[in-house]
A protein has these predicted regions:
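Short glycine/serine/threonine-rich phosphate/pyrophosphate-binding segments
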Residues: 20, 43-47, 73, 98-105, ...
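C-terminal charged capping/lid subdomain of soluble metabolic enzymes
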Residues: 290-355
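A glycine/threonine-rich phosphate-anchoring loop and its flanking beta-alpha core
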Residues: 108-201
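Solvent-exposed alpha-helices and their adjacent loops that cap or buttress functional pockets
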Residues: 5-7, 27-29, 84-86, 107, ...
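ATP/NTP phosphate-donor binding region
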Residues: 1-90, 309
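A short, small-residue-rich loop immediately preceding and capping a beta-strand
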Residues: 83-120
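Active-site segments that bind and position negatively charged phosphate/pyrophosphate groups
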Residues: 193-303, 310
Length: 355
């Protein structure tokens, strides 16, 4: 039986300069007592803005939780208990991808409304109903599929533009794969991250990711390198966070993400998620013999995304480790079922070496 089309997205998305200090006006829709999660670096940089955003709207003084550890199931369950014990009625996550995954999982287990405030455009997870859980050693554990998307996403483009440039470029890598993975999922009659078929809206959003990167990606990086925001930067941030978030979740994931997650078994792989996805995409496009391969390779070269094992710092990887990565990729049955081109473990190892 054919799958029904299923779409999901955040309850509300707000983007613009200075919005972090104005978040109180939006949070008042969700509750009055927030459990606010961030890491030490975020607190040092943004604490005053965060507090002002609450005080301006007469919200209760938030409960601040500083956490620098991994996003493990045990950790988030304990924080969910703490949020409830402190009588909080909403969860707010402020930070990068890991911190937002933590906030999502805490809100899920505490059964509370959720607001996420990304401080970088390094990945497309903020808008999704997915939290990525890891083991204590940092290796990939599983996707925690949430009952709903975040109720509110607030993106302060001044904050995001000030993030390390490598993070935004990594976000381009994540967004770059969105269209091709959604296209593969649709061709394979696969399931998106909601368990349904990708619909037209999701595929349009996914395609818009690719078009936006081709139009604005290089210019946006140039502007960010000079320390300035611009229309190109605003479009890139929307692409990395919103368009790619909707596109991957409602469009589906395939080989590129399976490879990125497979690489996490290697302690020596220090690549950011989006960088690993970019490499995975190159492998996927080679497998599919996609006509866009050369354009993708040129774009990656211009913005500084990795396309080879050597670029990832894995030029000396052993055959045994490569086989281990291939085994991990094939254990990701959910993503691999959406890959339109058939591949064996042996062929995958060959493609990774040739990329």
């Amino acid at each position: 039986m054919a799958l029904p089309m299923v779409y999901g997205g955040p309850g509300r998305y707000v983007q613009g300069p200075g919005e972090l200090s104005r978040q109180g006006r939006y949070l008042s829709w969700l509750g009055c007592a927030a459990y606010v999660l961030f890491d030490q670096g975020t607190e040092d940089r943004l604490c005053r803005q965060i507090v002002d955003g609450f005080l301006d709207e007469d919200l209760s003084e938030p409960f601040f939780k500083i956490y620098n550890g991994p996003c493990t199931e045990d950790a988030v369950v304990e924080m969910a208990k703490e949020a409830r014990a402190e009588y909080c009625d909403m969860v707010v996550g402020i930070g990068g991808g890991k911190m937002l995954d933590i906030a999502k999982a805490v809100a899920f287990y505490a059964e509370l409304p959720l607001c996420v405030c990304p401080t970088a455009a390094s990945m497309d997870g903020p808008c999704s109903a997915i939290s990525v859980l890891y083991h204590e050693d940092g290796s990939f554990d599983r996707y925690l599929m949430l009952e709903k998307n975040p109720d509110l996403v607030v993106v302060d483009t001044n904050v995001v533009a000030a993030a390390p440039l490598r993070m935004t470029v990594a976000g381009m890598g994540d967004a770059l794969a969105t269209y091709f993975e959604a296209r593969s999922c649709a061709a394979a009659h696969g399931a998106n991250e909601h368990g349904g078929a990708p619909g037209h809206l999701a595929l349009v959003a996914a395609r818009a990711c690719y078009d936006t990167l081709m139009e604005c990606g290089v210019a946006a990086k140039r502007d960010l390198k000079k320390g300035r925001t611009s229309p190109a930067v605003e479009r890139l941030i929307e692409c990395n966070i919103l368009l790619s978030g909707v596109g991957f979740e409602s469009g589906g994931l395939a080989l590129a993400h399976a490879i990125a997650n497979g690489l996490t078994i290697l302690p020596e792989c220090k690549a950011m998620h989006g960088e690993a996805v970019a490499f995975g995409l190159v492998v996927q496009l080679r497998l599919e013999r996609a006509p866009e391969l050369d354009q993708v390779l040129e774009f990656c070269q211009r913005v500084g995304l990795p396309t080879t094992l050597e670029d990832l710092g894995l030029g000396e990887i052993s055959d045994a480790d490569l086989q281990g990565v291939a085994n991990a990729v094939f254990r990701n049955e959910r993503n691999m079922a959406n890959e339109q081109a058939k591949v064996t473990k042996q062929k995958l190892v060959q493609l990774m070496c040739e990329a």
